[in-house]
């Protein structure tokens, strides 16, 4: 399974690690992904998703159904 948020599509970021002597090396900054079982009230069932912690905060604020609808994702297919 790839390291991609199933709701937002967030992926790893290519960055640079800079040492004290300013030597720059490539570094991959991974998304903070969590495997969660979330209750989908409209579908009256649990949905297992791999989401970022940022998406989890938004789900707590808006609700899973409303957030998925705003992103154009059909939870019935998941």
From Swiss-Prot:
One record GO biological process: translation
* GO CC, alphabetical: ribonucleoprotein complex; ribosome
Q: List GO molecular-function terms, semicolon-separated.
A: structural constituent of ribosome
Keywords in UniProt for this one?
Ribonucleoprotein, Ribosomal protein
Read off the SUPFAM superfamilies from this record: L28p-like (SSF143800)
Task: Show the Pfam families listed in the entry.
Answer: Ribosomal_L28
The family note in this entry says: Belongs to the bacterial ribosomal protein bL28 family.
From the Swiss-Prot or TrEMBL record, give the protein name.
Large ribosomal subunit protein bL28
């Amino acid at each position: 399974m790839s390291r991609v948020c199933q709701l937002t599509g967030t992926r790893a970021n290519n960055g640079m690690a800079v040492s004290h002597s300013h030597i720059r090396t490539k570094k991959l900054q991974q998304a903070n992904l969590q495997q969660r079982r979330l209750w989908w009230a409209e579908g009256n069932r649990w949905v297992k998703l791999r989401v970022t912690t940022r998406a989890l905060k938004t789900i707590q604020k808006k609700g899973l159904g409303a957030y998925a609808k705003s992103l154009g994702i059909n939870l019935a297919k998941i």
